[in-house]
């Protein structure tokens, strides 16, 4: 028999159990990424299919976009999407190595000089977003010491990424600056 790369699934839980209902919901309504994550966490699936599904959201600048975080749509990379990607990688034990080095280069490129991440990058507006996502106009020089076009750093955007990278023992120059910003 040819090897397909798919891991054999354990038998499904009894038909009336909450896990069975959750599994049915995932297979009927979720994106491929969430299906692979469910299989990884509950059906003894591998991490490679999760990583492959996540790769579809990676952008040319090594960030993540394409609506990875459901609260923000559009193809462009955003710190919000990239933080979501790091959480996925962390959940499957793959938050390290060259993959995360490339993500840190992206984070360096989009952060303020002190390492802070913006919630939403300027110039990336015009795509649908949840009503609570802070999409604001490009900062003016008067309200931003960095000048027009530079985003304000946000603690709420920076802290989760910094904490996750520290938990995974990632070392990067951007991370040192971002850590100082958080403290």
Model-predicted segments: where are they?
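Preference for long, amphipathic alpha-helical scaffolds in soluble/luminal domains
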Residues: 1-183
